[in-house]
């Protein structure tokens, strides 16, 4: 890839290059083409199951937590053990919208394609700040999967082009089928926020 097609930060370039590989694998040749992580999931041997299908297996206490008071504490979950055919079971939070589901699933797809060792999320201890941390949780791995997934869903080159055209984060989000929050995250980490604000302001003044 040409350096002009990549974000200015080292970490951003790292994620973008890996994201480009994923998009190429998905058969996408243009940066503005939306990526559907649900189509990629089967190649990553991920089986996405609706929450309704596993709900009968859960206790009332668990259900109340997952879709009640704890609904904002999780986006999706992967079974620790694979199915007999080798696929891994993925459950997405039913209280989240489809745009957020796409980002969550894309992160899980990236874990597989990047060769990450699965993180186990059993509670083990509290850190120095008193916050509960998970056993075997690797922040670097989680950041790489999320960053790569976000870059695959919203490529830098397309993002930069749309910002130059004066498109809003909401318009870009609709195009790629993701949340506005994810678009604005990408704008900021790609160091395009100042350009975005300038162009949006200029568009409104016309």
Regions found by a protein language model. Give the residues of each.
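Active-site hotspot residues in diverse enzymes, especially metal/ion-binding acidic/histidine motifs
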Residues: 1-206
């Amino acid at each position: 890839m040409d350096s002009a097609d990549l974000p200015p930060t080292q970490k951003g370039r790292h994620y973008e290059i890996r994201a480009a590989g994923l998009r190429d694998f998905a058969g996408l040749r243009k940066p503005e083409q939306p990526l559907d992580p649900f189509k990629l999931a089967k190649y990553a041997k991920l089986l996405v199951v609706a929450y309704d299908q596993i709900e009968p297996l859960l206790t009332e206490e668990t259900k109340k937590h997952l879709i009640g008071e704890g609904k904002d504490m999780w986006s999706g979950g992967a079974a620790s053990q694979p199915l007999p055919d080798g696929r891994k079971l993925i459950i997405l939070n039913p209280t989240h919208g489809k745009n957020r589901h796409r980002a969550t699933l894309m992160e899980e797809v990236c874990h597989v394609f990047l060769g990450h060792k699965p993180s186990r999320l059993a509670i083990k201890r509290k850190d120095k700040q008193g916050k509960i941390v998970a056993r075997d949780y690797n922040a670097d791995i989680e950041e790489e999967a999320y960053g790569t997934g976000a870059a695959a869903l919203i490529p830098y080159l397309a993002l930069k082009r749309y910002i130059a055209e004066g498109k809003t984060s909401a318009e870009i989000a609709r195009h790629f089928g993701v949340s506005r929050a994810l678009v604005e995250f990408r704008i900021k980490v790609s160091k395009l926020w100042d350009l975005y604000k300038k162009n949006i302001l200029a568009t409104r003044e016309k």
